[in-house]
């Protein structure tokens, strides 16, 4: 009963040891014994909630069907609809394995495509491959070596840059596209190898020389350039190698010969060696409104390769979100990013900026305890507080107090998902709350394929 009152925005004052006064209040011959203490003006919305059969679910004007609530009313959601309590279209999906997260995610992706948005997803289990092919999308298995994202092709991290955003990575504070990308590359190379500051500064100097060699400056019109117009990692390696072979101590360079040698040794595998098949090449991903990056094989790769590849994919997503716009980036199994705290910072700052271009991010994960650890707890909290649209399934065996604190749940809200209910979740939409039973129309279910989430 208390849960229903809370959902109807009716606050409850518990009258302990006041039965006699309560009886007088409701008795035909009694009087209002609590009037002076508890009487207040009742809002019209609360009065309306007292009427029977007043509930109509959620019916956004341009919304798409995602299921029914516990009363049987339809839930139609338009994620782009802004309100005082919904300032972006970012989405969060959390829950234990087997509760229906993948099913909901596939339904939301199809709805977003139907609404006219482009979608880029990171598929950790290759669950979306059949659906991608069914709707004419592009499935790119990054470990197969067929598709490539050129690391040295400048990507946008912020359309204007805010030098005062001291809590953001350096790439978000630069004002020009080339400066943003060089700042990103410094973090990228750190993710690949444990380079010192001196190594990174040397690489930065070499990058500046490389872009000048290819005629790329701050004033370059990048919209007119083709993927093949940009340098690739082997070009960077050749430039550094030339600097090393022709090093002249009498010129008093900012970097030493030994530094160049160590940088060459650290970058050899990525530029010329075994890892070059994943990084060294021009971007050749087909233009598609639905692009799925298959990263299943990446999860078993070496940690440095995995971190660098995830960083590279994140840069591609950010560029589409902030330059093309009207795009949704979906990151499934968010926990795989936790091995790289810098990547978490980039995701957090993307969440804050994508709304400017009518874009959004969809984050999904299961083991919430992975995010509640020393060293990453403060970085991951915004990932759960920024999205105004949250779909919370049963979390399994987890500490109740920390779960409620991290997701800012009330006791009554937690009780709704305390026990496993396959396909049922708590849908938090700004200040609105719905106990949602996820249902997809039959014609959309046929597109889901035979993998997870069917």
Where are the language model's segments positioned?
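P-loop NTPase motor domains
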Residues: 10-11, 22-75, 81, 124-138, ...
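Conserved AAA+ ATPase core "coupling" helix
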Residues: 148-153, 398-405
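Accessory regions of macromolecular translocation/handling assemblies
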Residues: 1-37, 75-81, 85-105, 109-110, ...
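Walker A/P-loop NTP-binding active-site region of P-loop NTPases
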Residues: 99-151
């Amino acid at each position: 009963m208390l849960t229903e009152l809370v959902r109807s925005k009716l606050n409850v004052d518990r009258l302990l040891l006041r039965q006699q006064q309560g009886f007088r209040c409701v008795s035909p011959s009694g009087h209002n014994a609590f009037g002076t203490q508890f009487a207040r003006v009742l809002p019209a919305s609360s009065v309306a909630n007292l009427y029977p059969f007043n509930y109509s679910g959620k019916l956004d004007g341009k919304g798409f069907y995602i299921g029914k609530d516990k009363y049987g009313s339809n839930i139609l959601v338009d994620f782009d609809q802004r309100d005082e309590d919904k300032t972006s279209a970012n989405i969060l999906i959390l829950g234990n394995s087997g509760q229906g997260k993948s099913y909901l995610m596939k339904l939301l992706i199809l709805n977003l495509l139907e609404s006219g948005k482009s979608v880029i997803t990171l598929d950790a289990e290759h669950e979306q491959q059949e659906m991608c092919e069914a709707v004419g999308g592009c499935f790119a298995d990054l470990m197969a070596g067929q598709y490539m994202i050129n690391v040295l092709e400048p990507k946008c991290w912020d359309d204007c840059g805010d030098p005062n955003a001291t809590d953001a990575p350096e790439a978000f504070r630069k004002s020009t596209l080339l400066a943003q990308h060089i700042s990103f590359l410094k973090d990228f190379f750190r993710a690949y190898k444990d380079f010192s500051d001196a190594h990174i500064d040397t690489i930065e100097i070499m990058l500046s020389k490389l872009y000048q060699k290819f005629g790329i400056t701050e004033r370059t019109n990048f919209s007119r350039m083709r993927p093949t117009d940009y340098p690739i990692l082997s070009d960077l390696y050749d430039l550094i190698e030339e600097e090393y072979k022709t090093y002249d101590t009498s010129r008093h360079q900012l970097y030493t010969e030994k530094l160049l040698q160590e940088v060459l040794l650290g970058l050899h595998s990525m530029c010329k060696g075994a890892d070059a098949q994943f990084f060294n090449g021009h971007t050749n991903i087909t233009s598609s409104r639905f692009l799925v990056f298959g990263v299943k094989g990446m999860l078993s790769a070496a940690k440095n390769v995995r971190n660098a590849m995830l960083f590279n994919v994140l840069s591609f997503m950010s560029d589409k979100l902030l330059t093309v716009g009207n795009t949704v980036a979906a990151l499934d199994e968010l926990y795989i990013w936790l091995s790289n705290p810098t990547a978490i910072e980039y995701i957090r700052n993307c969440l804050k900026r994508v709304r400017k271009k009518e874009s959004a991010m969809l984050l999904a994960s299961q083991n919430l305890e992975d995010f509640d650890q020393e060293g990453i707890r403060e970085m991951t909290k915004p990932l759960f507080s920024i999205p105004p649209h949250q779909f919370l399934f049963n979390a399994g065996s987890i500490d109740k107090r920390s779960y409620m604190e991290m997701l800012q749940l009330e006791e009554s809200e937690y009780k709704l998902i305390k026990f496993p209910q396959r396909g049922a979740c708590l849908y938090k939409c700004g200040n609105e709350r719905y106990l949602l039973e996820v249902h997809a129309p039959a014609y959309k279910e046929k597109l889901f394929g035979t993998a997870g989430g069917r």
